[in-house]
Every structure is written in C-alpha cells, then in structure tokens.
Amino acid sequence: MPNIEELKQRQEKIRNFSIIAHIDHGKSTLADRILEKTETVSSREMQAQLLDSMDLERERGITIKLNAIELNYKAKDGETYIFHLIDTPGHVDFTYEVSRSLAACEGAILVVDAAQGIEAQTLANVYLALDNDLEILPVINKIDLPAADPERVRTEIEDVIGLDASEAVLASAKAGIGIEEILEQIVEKVPAPQGDVEAPLQALIFDSVYDAYRGVILQVRVVNGMVKTGDKIQMMSNGKTFDVTEVGIFTPKAVGRDYLATGDVGYVAASIKTVADTRVGDTVTLADNPAAEPLHGYKQMNPMVFAGLYPIESNKYNDLREALEKLQLNDASLQFEPETSQALGFGFRCGFLGLLHMDVIQERLEREFNIDLIMTAPSVVYHVNTTDGEMLEVSNPSEFPDPTRIDTIEEPYVKAQIMVPQEYVGAVMELAQRKRGDFETMEYIDDNRVNVIYQIPLAEIVFDFFDKLKSSTRGYASFDYELSEYRRSQLVKMDILLNGDKVDALSFIVHREFAYERGKLIVDKLKKIIPRQQFEVPIQAAIGQKIVARTDIKALRKNVLAKCYGGDVSRKRKLLEKQKAGKKRMKAIGSVEVPQEAFLSVLSMDEDEK
C-alpha cells in the first residue's frame, strides 16, 4: 500500500480526458490510435473501433455506451503519466451519456473534421464541456483528405465556439499523424485532478454493468479519498451498504488492483444483487467514515418519447421485463411500466430520450435477448387541461380523456438547430414549415454554412423528421434539439375502427389541420395490408364520434351458383340469400386479425403520400 505522499505524487501525474466529436469525425479512430501509441493494446489485439464493444455500435459506426480506459504514457519530459480516456457518444439522443462522462473528466479533446468543419452536435457537446469547466484541446482531424481545409476550420472554431485554435493540432487519426502532439498537449494543458486522498471517500458512479457472477459492477471516478478491497461502502442516496470484493481498472479488459485513489477512474465490484440499489450519478462513500455530502450528480434526464413494446409471443412477457431491467441498469434514462392493450395483449410503455435511443433499445432487445417485438407509434407527453381545471400529463393516446372533458391541450416544442449548406436552406425551411415549425433565427457560420433555428413540435420530430431532413439535404444537414416549452395546440385524438371496434394500439394524436389527410392515408394503407375476410370489413378513422374517413375491405365469396346450371331464378336467389345470411352471422361474431405490418404502417407514413 503506497503512503500518502506517493499517492499525492501519483495524483499529479493523472490526466482524465474525453474525446468529443460529431458522428463520423473520427473519434473512435483517434481513440484506437491513442491506445496503440501508448501500447495499451498489443497490435495483435487491435481492431477498428476497439472501444465500441457492442455489435450494434460497430455496425452503425456510432458510439452508444461510454467506456473508461487507463493508459500509461511516457512523455517527452521523461515522466510516465496515467491517462484515463473516457470515450463518449456523439449522437444527440445520447447527450446524457456525454454529460455523465464529462463529469468524470478535467479535459476534453474536441475533434473537428478538416473537410466538414463544425457540426450541430459538436457545438452541443462543446457547450456541455464548457458547463463542466473542462480544458478543451481542439484537434483538426482528417487533414490527409483531399477536401481538407484546416485553416478554414481553425477560424471556424475561433469564430463559432470562441476557443483559441492557434495551437490546434493538425492530425489524421487514420494515418497516425499528430497523435504524439495530442498526447503531449494532454500532459501540458489538462489539469491534474483536484481532490484530497486523506478526505473521506467520495466516488461518482458514472456507469454500471451487470455481471451474472459478481453482481452489479460500478464504474466510478474517485473524487476524494480512496477505496480498496475489503472496504464497506455506502450509497449516499439510499444508505445501503456493501462489502467491496474487487476494485480495478479497464485497459480495455478489466484488471484487478489493490486500491483506487483520488483521480482514478475504474470499477468497484461489491456483490450488489439488485440493479435498483445503484443509481448512475450517485456518490459512493465508506460506511465507517462517510462523506458529509454527496457530489452533485447529473441532472435526471426525462424521457421525451414514449412507445408501447409488446412481445409477439405473449409467453415472453416476463423475459421482456427481465431484459428491460437489465438494459435499465446501465441506461438510467430508460423508463418502463406495464400496460395492456386489447389488440396486443400484455406489454410495457417505455420512455426514451429520442428516436435513435428507441431504435437502439428495440434492436438490443431483439438481438441480445432474442425477443421479437411489436412497437406502437411513438408519442410524446401532452399536457391536457380538463374542463374541471385539472392538468393531466398523458403520454399514451389511449389514455386521453373524452373530447367533451378536454378544455385545452399543450404539446412540447423543441428548439431545433439545423446546420446546413446554403443551397439547402430552402429545402430545410420548407420541411420545417410542413412540420408546423416556427422560424426563429438564421445565422451564417461561414460563406457556405448556415445555422437555422426553428421551434418545432416534438411530436413532428419523433415521427420521421430526421430521415426527411437527411434526404432533403442529401445527408449534409446536421441537427440537434433541446426541449424549449409547452404550447397550446389544436390537437385531436384519432381512433381507427375495424368492423366497428376501436383498435387501441392504432390510436394517435394529430393536429386538427392534418386530421382528415392522415386519417384517409391510414385507412387506405390498412386496406392494402389487412387480408380479406369472409365478410366485408369497414375501416374507419374517427375523431370522437365523428367519422372522418372510411374504406371497406371487400368480402371473399364462394360462387354458390356454380352447381346450378340452368334452373329457376328463385332457386338461385334462395342460395344467394342463404349465403348472405351466413355472411351476416359471421360478421356479427367475426373478429379481424391485424397483422404486425399494420401497426408499423402507422409509423411510416410518408409526407409524399399525404
């Protein structure tokens, strides 16, 4: 066990930093190069996007989970420094992951693509880093590209973000250029962690993973004090205590250690059995010498998008619950509660941070846990003011009160920042207008790029805004949004009736202006998807009692006259009447099977079809 002096000297050598960048600006590649350069990973084990350990991350080329890795770097001054690289996601839905990892750092490397310049999400993450008082080191990456223009990007960093970019490193993570300069700048510019080894333990939980053998493993950043195997730790939010069975660091693989001291980033295993006992953002302290107060954690992220998740096989309901609990463990922002639907049976109403988050969760459930799912149309949280003066928060269309009880409805608006090349400004404005957006401001970043700011209803964004934005700007636009306010809107709930019965899972909320078109579109779409029955099935779209659109699926009929060659007309009529009576009886008791595509079709309604 080293003495206090040695620990303090070691603390001087620690550098905690993360890498922030927009998607595809080369963040994971840079992390790979840093791992190679510091010889943390042997060239035999090296693979591209090493830190993106989920298959899903590799395939989509995005970082979803954060990772924390310890590296040793021998600097030019002859000293060996301990680096903790905390890898962060770049996508707007994972901002909370970014804020968690930045809370564990003192510095951040800002990677900007030399050809593309600053993008909307780069800005969003930089502001998070500035809020956390981090030292920011700009790096202009991909300088070996033919289209690279490092000087333009340098002035952009200075003008748009206001950082001094005169010492920005020009690098190419792919070709391995400039990596050493980056490492030297980390040593010089990123401050060593503040904190006192002798103070009572305070460690911030920034992530947790579930291990079937060792229980919940916490990833922590030690802010004050130290923790070692055999200590009794206590969670400050709920006072529960556990015995530490193992502490250690990640070099991507977990490596056991005797202790973690101030400034260290590593893991603590304490045979914690239940997921609920450890909340990300909580403070760990020692039971026999607790800290006076917890560290300020993160702001609790509230889900913005809700959808119902139902297992296709109803006996998988419990498996789905267990899977969601496991995902919730290291994704504190996922919320879920049980719900039932007449059409789909038992399932869960889940809350997500955004569409990508929803997609990723759905895909992880299907892949990692082998559960086939039906997902209902995503909706947002509405504020419904009733006639008797109550305010209800409703996230599920089927929970909307009767139209006669509703006084006003408010829906969430977001402030959307869209960065786009000048020639696509028209297309972006047209799209935003069509999505009921209100124009706020527009500013030119340089001769060619424009930052357009709109207030847009979140309900329109969760629908298909991102895909539409990408296709109308040929993929050049980048987009970031944050919740701004609730506004009163003319909204109505639309029900879909099949054979006179409401299908609760197909209900959705729509603006009164688009109600007729949307209703017409859906009934036509369902007509194509729902197979023909033995009897005629009317499909109707209704607002309250009023039917706004209708179409019929024609019945399949057998030719009952085939066996009458000639014969009297009354004989034929008798057979037809008999068939008609049979169909009528069938229709009265018949129920219509709704295929899964029908639910999905409500999701994927194209504007162009409107």
Curated annotation (Swiss-Prot):
One of its GO terms (molecular function) is ribosome binding. GO terms for biological process: positive regulation of translation. SMART domains: EFG_C. Residues 12-194 form the tr-type G domain. GTP binds at residues 24-29, 141-144. Signal peptide: none annotated. Its main location: membrane. GO terms for cellular component: plasma membrane. It catalyses: GTP + H2O = GDP + phosphate + H(+). It is an enzyme of class 3 (hydrolase). It is found in: Cell membrane. Required for accurate and efficient protein synthesis under certain stress conditions. May act as a fidelity factor of the translation reaction, by catalyzing a one-codon backward translocation of tRNAs on improperly translocated ribosomes. Back-translocation proceeds from a post-translocation (POST) complex to a pre-translocation (PRE) complex, thus giving elongation factor G a second chance to translocate the tRNAs correctly. Binds to ribosomes in a GTP-dependent manner. This is Elongation factor 4. The lineage of its organism: Bacteria, Bacillati, Bacillota, Bacilli, Lactobacillales. The gene is lepA.
